[in-house]
Amino acid sequence: MTRSVLVPSSLVREAEDKREATRKLGYVARAAAVFRIDRVVVFPDEDGERQWGGGFVETVLRYAATPPYLRKEAFDTRDELAYAGVLPPLRLSSWTGSDSSGSGSLRQGIVTQVGSEGRVRVNCGMQHPISLHEPPGMAVSEGERVTIRVSSRRPVRAKLVDDPLPGFSVERTGLGDALDRSDAGVRIATSRHGEPLSVASLGGYRERIARDGVTVAFGAPERGLPPMLGVSADAVNESVTDSSADAPARFDAWLNTIPDQGSEVVRTEEAVLATLGSLTLTE
């Protein structure tokens, strides 16, 4: 089961300066961490972009999703990261080791050197890079991020494993490609024109998400998903009122997850928190 969040490249379009734009992206990263999101996708919305576009959004989110002990290794000095200091700490359990089991905790690492005889050196936040055997059938290259299972710190005992990287990944791809993934699960578009999410309807979505996973797409301030996708509000409303009508733009459902909003504009980072908080409720 995979949980994915899709955000537009115009996400920070109303930010007054780079500091505020960075802080907004930090809130999105925090939401992804808190609600155990596996993948954050930045999809293009060039018509809605202003001063900071998809490259900025992707870079800041990638930086936030990188464990602090790897950031210096993974990122050089970049203009996009001028205000990275305002990003809130994510403190993912997979980074701190508090999510470990009896077989050891998973950590991200970066391959710093590929040697001979199937050995590689990996920076994984220990005092020094550690030397590990490359498992049979697993080929890694210098600079690649890898997953390491640490069973002991003193003395250091660890091994490379072919598991997904701990935390959430960040990528930049088209909305259609993200929806077409085999692990997309329930594909939900968020919009004020969608079906108001209620206690009655939440149960059905919760069961499907627990079984199949979920992909949730969000719009940008003053520019929701309908105009981004060339979908009319009437088409969205029709899919809500007519149970026989298909949801537009290849989604399974359009949901209004803040049905009684008290502000004219809901910011994307606010919508992400409200939506994920609702969809991850348990009985």
Swiss-Prot record:
Superkingdom: Archaea
CDD domains recorded: HsC9orf114-like
One Pfam family cited in the UniProt record for this chain: Methyltrn_RNA_3
Transmembrane residue ranges: none
UniProt cross-references to PANTHER family, sorted A to Z: CLASS IV SAM-BINDING METHYLTRANSFERASE-RELATED (PTHR12150), METHYLTRANSFERASE C9ORF114-RELATED (PTHR12150:SF13)
Protein name: Uncharacterized protein VNG_1688C
